[in-house]
């Protein structure tokens, strides 16, 4: 704002987050929350690659028992068994089916957890997916007075801090994707990259 710049964005990968409160973009339960959770749904994330320490914690919790895990997204080897529900956003709707196994598991859990990754939030359906998962979180008790197991897993280390200080476009400003597009069309002549080495900027000229 002091520089009079409206086109500012820390969401280089296009994730449409940060507009609906801090709880909508942080790992609310912290990594220690894995130890308290009794059911887990992973959406659009491969924690084995994106967060190995977190993945090891999930595996440790699984080995302790009574910790069913479901996955929506790419079907990867995560080092622990899980119920694979599919890879499309439409598969999230299955969680509203009262006869679905994962619905019953999450509904019966005392401290269910959802981990949503950038794989679910960096496409055009990201806002709708996040909204749907928040609603499901409230339905299953993922979000309640004494427990918040709704967690967003970032693939960029500085993203949370940048969102905290408001590195988002103004109402008239352009998003990162729009900035890159306008740059390619020569409508933007200068882009200041601060701590950015994402693949999305490698082809900038």
Which sequence ranges carry the predicted segments?
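Catalytic alpha/large subunits of respiratory electron-transfer oxidoreductases
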Residues: 1-205
